[in-house]
Amino acid sequence: DVLARILDGEPDAVLFSCYLWNIRETLRLAAAVKAARPGAYVVLGGPEVSYNAGEVLAENPQVDYILSGEGERSVPMLLASLAAGRKPEEAAPPIPGLCARGFLSAPCVEEGTPPSPYAPAYLENLRGRIAYLETSRGCPYACAFCLSGRCGKPRWFPLEQAKRNILTLARSGAHTVKFIDRTFNANPAHANAILAFILKHYGRDIPAGVCFHFELAGDILREETFALLEQAPPGAFQLEIGMQSFCEKTLAAVRRKTDTGVLKQNIRRLVAMGNMHVHIDLIAGLPHEDLRTFGESFNTGYALGAQMLQLGFLKLLHGAAMREEPEEFPCVFSEDPPYEVQKTPWLSPEELDVLRAAEDALERCYNSGRFLETAAYAMAAAGLSPFVFYCRLGAAGARHGTANIPLDDYTAFLYNWCAALPGIDKACLRDAMVRDRLATNSTGRLPQCLHVTDALLGRAVKRLAQNPATAPLPGVRRGVALLYGTRQVVFVDYTQKNPVTGRYLLHTRSIDNLFTE
């Protein structure tokens, strides 16, 4: 119990970091702390209270102070003032970012390099988890939907410090080191030096298998960066590239500077390298984007072939221009976190529901990697664009109640829904779905909806085992199935997933030739 653990230490002050995902629970917890220890100071910080400190203080009497903005310098100054029995509002020099009732300060933006946050207790708990690393703060952009541009101009920390932290985190047992620099390649020299350092030490001082995640601006990538990324071992790098929209009017309205032509070209180039997991983002609910234009952005993004296309929904964050300038950005949004858009002049609530259902279908079929071939075949055979396909599939899933059903049940639902589309050959549909299931499910077992009793399968398994070129590896599980649309046998040995796609390698042999080899 978090409250019990806090009170067990009999604290004189309790400080909370507040984010979208924890603000409601944090305020309840703060009230409980104040009720149990009325003399203890309750202090909040973090992005969810930095731009609305006066409102939070007015609505929450249990909160004594808010530290707005960066806190590395202000936290120790506040604690020193409280420990000395002095009023923090009267501290000299002033405590940056300090907010109290009747005393508000602008969010603190530090110019110097922050101290290392990597205490031994943090490092000891990283095994099998994600470690977070920043080598810069601030953002060169000022997107109206985002807070990053409110955090000051970009400031890059010393490279030697970044290199030390990379080695420390990579050796901690974490499976991923995620750079939280808002635009990692905004300073190409800094970014390239870090990439080169990782590549130089990967597999030596940096254990093989550790993955490094970067958020990039795709349209400003330089040739030197491409050359470094191309050298990365498969699965060593993950790239996240925010597109948000391909509608030029929308991008201009939200003050997002993007060369969409260069962006598309560069994403295709990164995907074609085949050694990195590429994640791209779209946001639904932005200005001037209706269902038709959003569909165009979706189809454009889907065609780029990234391993993940995330369909997110606009959130009206405290401090973001889209929340603070409602006349310019009119929309209805939830008053509760995460403040998600409910209606815009261009999208009705019903249309947003269509997109949410499409997002669910996209996650299950494409982003999961589970039904890539199934979706590709169904779209091509039925003549549907990706956007229409996922909107219709999502709507059918919502009607069917697929939200929490097991994978085998969803497979059956997907098969039956796709089979009813015009132009679908059921044998070819089954082939695609069998390949998907074998490539992503290491049991090698097919669900009942794809199961066919055929004596030929047993003969094929035996024949594969007899041929040295296709014999199974000792002690390795194998999956085998017949493909009736193409008259092939498909088999897979579950040894190692592709580190980029997360799928196992499939092998096929012609049924007609199998018994003559």
Explain the meaning of each model-derived region:
Residues 12, 360-517:
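Radical SAM enzyme core and accessory elements
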Residues 1-167, 171:
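Acidic, low-complexity intrinsically disordered segments
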Residues 79, 191-192, 225-226, 320-325:
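Short aromatic-enriched loop/helix-cap "lid" or pocket-rim segments at secondary-structure transitions
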Residues 25-29, 55, 71, 158, ...:
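Residues at alpha-helix caps and immediate loop-helix transition turns in enzyme cores, especially N-
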Residues 34-39, 61, 87, 200-208, ...:
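Short helix-capping segments at alpha-helix termini
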Residues 116-272:
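Radical SAM [4Fe-4S] cluster-binding motif and immediate context
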Residues 15, 163, 168-180, 202, ...:
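Conserved C-terminal portion of the radical SAM core fold
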